[in-house]
Amino acid sequence: MPLSTSLLGKKSTYKDSYDVTLLFKIPRINNRNELGINSNNLPFYGVDVWNTYELSCLNKNGKPWVGVGTFYIPTDSENIVESKSFKLYLNSFNNFVVESVKELERIILQDLSNVTHAKVTGRIFPINTKVEFGVPSGKNIDDLDIVCNNYGAPDNSLIEYEDVLVEEEINSHLLKSNCLVTGQPDWGTIVIKYKGKKLKYDSFLKYLISFRNCNEFAEQCAERIFTDIKNAISPDFLSIYIVYARRGGIDICPYRSTDKSYTLPSDKRFIRQ
């Protein structure tokens, strides 16, 4: 189904009853082909973490319940879910009666698994769950005094390295791109951990800033950055985690790693979530 038939970028009416058909799938293979990624032999492992903040239903007495959800879509799923369709789908539960929160969780996980063709995991939390904010791990490179003049398209030629081997973690809050269809800004904090030739911080920061006017989905931006770093320095280990700011009641946080037994860098929200 072409992206032009989705609800993204169009005026939409919220359904007042549960409707799984609102979920719009996008094959990962389309964007991966553009990046030269073989979908049958992925160079990474990982997940897309979706945090959802507009989640409500009715209990058996008709009383509303509200909560938040976190869902993990495996990076080897056949499809991703278009974000606006997911928002509309979640809001279709607003007047839907469920026996329990566990039942709501089961329905959503099953629907997401069916649409993505993968085993989606996750959990729904009560609205009064205590939340702690975290900060990205590693060295922040944002205060470097650099001159930037490339905002047209991501430029991987900006990635330079030193002929010395390191194992380190760096981060930046200056990643920004735009939604492929609506053009709305996606603001991201990126955490990069790697073992290999040392990235030159100044040139790498320029590379990240070159995404500023790029029109791509969050997942594709993550895989482009992963691929560009991998091609530039051939690291023994590489992971990237991008935590995007909340937009439309959802934030998307792609994680990619060369390590099959990966663990996410942080389970705490950053301040822009």
Curated annotation (Swiss-Prot):
One of its GO terms (cellular component) is cytoplasm. The keyword NADP applies. It holds the Pfam family QueF. One of its GO terms (biological process) is queuosine biosynthetic process. HAMAP family: QueF_type2 (MF_00817). The keyword Zinc-finger does not apply. Belongs to the GTP cyclohydrolase I family. QueF type 2 subfamily. Its EC number is 1.7.1.13. GO terms for molecular function: preQ1 synthase activity. Keywords: Cytoplasm, NADP, Oxidoreductase, Queuosine biosynthesis. The gene is queF. Its main location: cytoplasm. It comes from the Bacteria. It catalyses: 7-aminomethyl-7-carbaguanine + 2 NADP(+) = 7-cyano-7-deazaguanine + 2 NADPH + 3 H(+). It is found in: Cytoplasm. NADPH binds at residues 83-84, 247-248. The lineage of its organism: Bacteria, Pseudomonadati, Pseudomonadota, Alphaproteobacteria, Rickettsiales. It comes from Rickettsia conorii (strain ATCC VR-613 / Malish 7). Pathway: tRNA modification; tRNA-queuosine biosynthesis. It is an enzyme of class 1 (oxidoreductase). Homodimer. Catalyzes the NADPH-dependent reduction of 7-cyano-7-deazaguanine (preQ0) to 7-aminomethyl-7-deazaguanine (preQ1). The active site is at 179 (thioimide intermediate), 186 (proton donor). InterPro entries: GTP-CH-I_C/QueF, NADPH_dep_7-cyano-7-deazaG_red, QueF, QueF_N, QueF_type2. This is NADPH-dependent 7-cyano-7-deazaguanine reductase. Substrate binds at residues 81-83, 218-219.
